Amino acid sequence: MGLTTFLQARRDAAELGEGVWRRAHDRFRRGLDRFHQILERLPEGEVLEQTIPLANELADLLPRVRAVAAAAQAAAPSSSTDVPASRDGRWSELHRALSKAGNAVAQCAEALAMMRCSGACASGCAKADAVSRRVAAVVEQVAAAEALLPGREQPQPAAPAVPAPADSAA
């Protein structure tokens, strides 16, 4: 282990702890690393050009995930595999959103690998669209996690539309 790796590990431990928030962040980072490893093996061409902006979009999410995990660690410290308890279930929901984001990044890497293995495709390739849809799911989960941070308003579920009672005039 080099000096920079050692210093990064200490910085991560101080900022993210050793519990569920650190694990959620690390899961996201590993999925992102895997996505970029697969991207590096794509042949030059249209598919690579379509995929690079998606890779950049995913990479831009890592600091946001780190900020969410650090804020969660500061507000509800975790040093084990147990999600901290809360009356309103906020920490469970936040952890669920971060976990879903990490899983969605892994699915992005999987979709990219499947696209790579299937070879070249015609313009308007549906396989590239699959990767794009998965990236959109990652963005959605990260935004959901950010919305659950303390100090941000909880999204209220929309009230169901109840039809007005009909006047029974006889």
What is the predicted role of each segment?
Residues 23, 27-34, 50-53, 57-60, ...:
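Charged, amphipathic alpha-helical oligomerization/scaffolding segments
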Residues 112-170:
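C-terminal amphipathic alpha-helix
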Residues 81-95, 169:
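Hydrophobic multi-pass inner-membrane translocation pores used for secretion
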